[in-house]
Amino acid sequence: MKGYHGKLALLGLLIFMMVFASACSSDKSSSDSKGGTSTDKKEPIKIGVLASKTGALEAYGKQTLRGFELGLDYATDGKREVAGRKIEFIVEDTETKPEVAVQKATKLLEEDNVDFLVGSSSSADTLAVLPLAEEYQKVMVVEPAAADSITGSEFNKYIFHSARNSSQDAVAGAAAIAKKGVKIATLAPDYSFGRDGVAAFKEAAKKLGAEIVKEEYADPAATDFTSNIQKIIDAKPDYLFVVWAGANSPWKQLSDMKVQEKGIKISTGAPDIAALSTMEPLIGMEGFTVYYHDLPKNKINAWLVAEHKKRFNGDVPDLFTPGGMSAAISIVEALKKTNGNADADKLITTMEGMSFETPKGKMTYRKEDHQALQSLYAIKLEKKDGVPYPVPVLIRELTPEETAPPIRNK
């Protein structure tokens, strides 16, 4: 009997140990499926960024990319994570060529399986890519391309335009110079950005009573504007309004051909710092700007300026840096609201009418056409000691309500 009871006790001990081990295993399995460890197993959110890393708009691409990365860091407190999902971004160079932009966007969508597209530096590149956002049902945040047609005739519901558009530029530009009896000529590059820009400016200027007496369109890659400028001189306008993007700007030739000495005042949107360096003859010009680092007075812009200087050898953020930052902030804010859900339909519902804080203050994606309503700045170019280019000095901030463009996607 004693042997029997000993075997029974041993069997009981073995059963207890098996049950205990099973319970421990079950607890471990349960803890692996929830809490902190599950974060590691969540798929990352992938963002495909299209930018001109080469070509005529290379500088714009660089500014946007710097801003986008800074925006991700600002909006996530440096974690690059939302709702337990890591944020990754993949950059592709469009080379400032629409056909290349389509190839690179297709690669991002099919091979990299991105959840968002962002870009591009060129309106022509961007317009070529818009149909892919609809085809693959992915939200695309457009920055810094500005053509009205992005949220107008070529709009689809997957497009959100964080950049300002040509009509917003036009309202600001017309406010600076257009009034009853004023004759205005225009000079712009011969592609969607330039033509949309002039069309919008004409509409705004005519409403204020001005007359458009000459429109000149130059090859976007032109380096000689002699013929265009001479035709403008011959038209004898009071003002020349210039819409331009790219390093091959007409400013030097406008000075060489003494346009202002002939009684024609020049007005434009103040460009990036590199182009401002060529605008010494335009000191005193009144116009507008999308951004200059000294103009917005808010904590996000203060952070941007300080952090940009820290990361980039003392350089200040340039014309399109805050746009890249704003695009990133808007994506992160939307993902916070969806708790990390990157389903396109859920994001669209969330982003329509969504407001978010940026280096330029509050922006709002208008529900009807997904255009970001935002501030622009009426400025005058002035010479400042210690600054090697004409500086945009604030006349007044133009509010999002003042610069709200017509809805053109109907």
Model-derived features with residue positions:
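Short, solvent-exposed amphipathic alpha-helices that sit
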Residues: 60-78, 100, 169-172, 192-211, ...
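Extracellular/periplasmic periplasmic-binding protein-like sensory domains
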Residues: 254-325, 336-337, 342, 390-410
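Solvent-exposed, acidic/polar segments of extracytosolic/periplasmic ligand-binding ectodomains
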Residues: 27, 34-35, 358-410
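Beta-alpha junction/loop-to-helix N-cap segments that form part of ligand/metal-binding clefts
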Residues: 28-36, 59-66, 74, 78-152, ...
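Hydrophobic alpha-helical segments within soluble ligand-binding/sensing domains
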Residues: 101, 162-184, 195-196, 223-226, ...
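Extracytoplasmic ligand/sensor domains, especially the bilobed periplasmic-binding protein
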Residues: 114-216, 262-287
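Extracytoplasmic "Venus flytrap"
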Residues: 48-71, 92-98, 121-122, 189-195, ...
